[in-house]
Design a protein with these regions (language model features):
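Helix-breaking motifs and short loop linkers at transmembrane-helix boundaries and internal kinks
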Residues: 43, 75, 96-101, 130, ...
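Helix-loop-helix hairpin linking two adjacent transmembrane segments in secondary transporters
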Residues: 131-132, 138-187
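Intracellular juxtamembrane helix-capping segments at the cytosolic ends
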Residues: 116-129, 311-325
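Conserved MFS/SLC helix-loop-helix module at the cytosolic interface between two early adjacent transmembrane helices
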Residues: 62-100
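Cytoplasmic helix-loop-helix junction between adjacent transmembrane helices
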Residues: 106-142
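Helix-to-loop junctions at the C-terminal end of transmembrane segments
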Residues: 63-75, 258-271
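A late C-terminal transmembrane helix in Major Facilitator Superfamily
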Residues: 327-362, 369
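Extracytoplasmic gate region of multi-pass secondary transporters
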Residues: 31-32, 207-249, 253-259
C-alpha cells in the first residue's frame, strides 16, 4: 500500500484554514463602499476602477493553474507562506496611495497571494479531512465570505476616522496573524513530485473539467460583479458609503451562512444537484430583484444573492473534489477548475463596467449575470455522481491496486441512471 503523507495536527491545520480564509476577501470587498472617495482622489473612473477587481480575479486564475507545479517543487508550506506574504504586502502598499496604478498593483499582489492559497488548500483538506471534506470546505468558504463581510462593513467606518487608504492598509494585520500561526503550529508535508498514474487521462483534456470550469466561472463572475458594483449602484441612488458597505456586508454574511450550511445539508448524499439548484434559484431571485426593483427590498436581494453565491461556491468546490479519490489528483482538478474559472470570472466586472458605460445604469450588469445563471442551471444537471468515474476516465481496479478504496462515485455505478453525464 502506498503510504499517504498527511499533515500532522489536523486541529492546527483547521485553525490555519480559518485564519487564511478570513484574509482572502477583504482586499476586494473593502473597495466598493469607498469607490466614490477613491474616484474623487485618484480619478480612476468606472472602467479603471473595475481593474481593482478584474485583475486580482485574473491573476488568481493564472496563479492557481501554476500552483500544482509549484507544489511539486516546493511543497505546501513555502507556498502558503509566500501567499500570506503577498497578501500582507499588497494590503500594506495601500497605506499611502497616491495613484490608481499603485492601487491596482496592490490588488495584483493580493490576487497572486489568494491564488497560491486556493490552489494549495483544497488538496490539503482532501488529504487531512478525507471523511469531512464538505464540512471543512464549508468552513473555509464561510470564513472567506465572513472576511469579505468584515472588509465591507468595517473599512468605510474606519475610513471616517482615518484616511481611506490607511483603512485599507489595516487589513495587512490579520494576515500577519495567519503567517505567525503557520510558522508556529502547523506542520505540512514536504514536496513530492507527482504525475498522473499510467493510463489516467490529463485532466485538462476531459470535457467534465471544462464543465466544472464553466460553472465555477459563472459563480465567481457573479461574485466579482456584486463586489465591484453593488455599493456603487446604490451610491448612484443616493446612498452613503456606509450604507453601501452594509449592503455588501449583508450579502457576505448570507454567503457565510450558506457557504457553511448548504454543504452540510448536502453531505448526506453524494448527489449535490438539488442543493446546487436551490443556490441557483436564490441567485436568480436576488439578481432579478436588483434588476427590477432595486429599492423595494435591497437587503432581501442582497441576502438572496449572497446565499446563492456562497452555497454554490462551496458546493462546486466539494463537487470537484468528489470526482476523484486521490487527494493530489482531486486537488489538481480543483486547481484547474479554479484557474480557468477565475480567468472566466474576471470578465464579469469588466463587462458590467462596459454595460454601465453604454446604458448609464447597473440593470444591464444584473441581466448579464442572470443569463449566465440560466446556462449554469443546464450544466448542473450533468453532475450525476454515478458517472464520475466514467467521465474522469478512472478505473476502479487500478485504484484498488494502489491500495485506495474505490470512491463512492465508482461504487454507485452498479446502479445505472438515465441522467446524462
Amino acid at each position: 500500500m502506498v503510504k499517504r503523507h498527511l499533515p500532522s495536527g489536523s486541529g492546527a491545520l483547521l485553525v490555519l484554514v480559518v485564519l487564511i480564509g478570513i484574509n482572502l476577501r477583504p482586499f476586494l470587498t473593502a473597495i466598493g463602499p469607498l469607490a466614490g472617495q477613491i474616484d474623487a482622489q485618484l480619478g480612476l473612473g468606472m472602467d479603471r476602477l473595475a481593474w481593482v477587481t478584474l485583475l486580482p480575479l485574473l491573476l488568481i486564475g493564472v496563479g492557481v493553474l501554476l500552483t500544482p507545479a509549484l507544489l511539486d517543487k516546493a511543497g505546501p508550506r513555502p507556498l502558503l507562506g509566500a501567499a500570506l506574504l503577498l497578501l500582507m504586502l499588497g494590503s500594506a502598499l495601500r497605506l499611502d496611495l497616491y495613484s490608481g496604478t499603485l492601487l491596482i498593483a496592490s490588488a495584483a499582489l493580493c490576487g497572486l497571494g489568494s491564488a497560491l492559497v486556493q490552489g494549495t488548500l483544497p488538496g490539503l483538506i482532501k488529504g487531512a479531512f478525507a471523511g469531512k471534506v464538505p464540512l471543512v470546505m464549508g468552513i473555509f468558504s464561510a470564513c472567506m465570505m465572513g472576511g469579505g463581510a468584515l472588509g465591507a462593513v468595517l473599512t468605510p467606518r474606519v475610513a471616517l476616522h482615518l484616511d481611506w487608504s490607511r483603512a485599507l492598509a489595516l487589513w495587512s494585520l490579520p494576515v500577519l496573524l495567519a503567517l505567525l500561526w503557520l510558522g508556529w503550529r502547523v506542520r505540512l508535508p514536504a514536496a513530492a513530485p507527482h504525475s498522473a498514474p499510467s493510463g489516467e487521462p490529463r485532466l485538462i483534456a476531459l470535457p467534465r473539467a471544462w464543465l466544472l470550469i464553466a460553472c465555477f466561472g459563472i459563480i465567481n463572475s457573479g461574485y466579482g460583479i456584486v463586489v465591484a458594483w453593488l455599493a456603487p449602484a446604490y451610491l448612484a441612488l443616493g446612498w452613503s458609503p456606509q450604507q453601501g458597505g452594509e449592503l455588501v456586508a449583508w450579502l457576505a454574511l448570507a454567503q457565510t451562512a450558506s457557504g457553511l450550511g448548504l454543504p452540510l445539508l448536502a453531505a448526506c448524499k453524494l448527489d449535490r444537484r438539488p442543493w446546487m439548484g436551490l443556490a441557483i434559484v436564490m441567485q436568480v431571485a436576488g439578481f432579478g430583484g436588483l434588476w427590477l426593483a432595486p429599492e423595494a427590498a435591497p437587503i432581501l436581494w442582497c441576502l438572496l444573492c449572497g446565499a446563492g453565491l456562497g452555497g454554490s461556491f462551496s458546493l462546486i468546490m466539494v463537487i470537484a473534489l468528489d470526482h476523484l479519490p486521490d487527494p493530489r489528483r482531486a486537488g489538481s482538478l480543483s486547481a484547474l477548475m479554479q484557474g480557468f474559472g477565475f480567468i472566466l470570472a474576471a470578465t464579469g466586472p469588466w463587462v458590467a463596467a462596459r454595460l454601465h458605460h453604454l446604458s448609464g445604469d447597473f440593470a444591464s450588469a444584473w441581466q448579464w449575470q442572470l443569463g449566465g445563471l440560466m446556462l449554469m442551471s443546464l450544466l448542473v444537471l450533468r453532475l450525476n455522481p454515478r458517472h464520475y468515474a466514467r467521465v474522469m476516465g478512472a478505473r476502479v481496479m487500478g485504484a484498488r491496486a494502489m491500495g485506495q478504496p474505490a470512491p463512492l462515485a465508482q461504487r454507485a455505478q452498479t446502479v445505472q441512471s438515465d441522467t446524462p453525464a
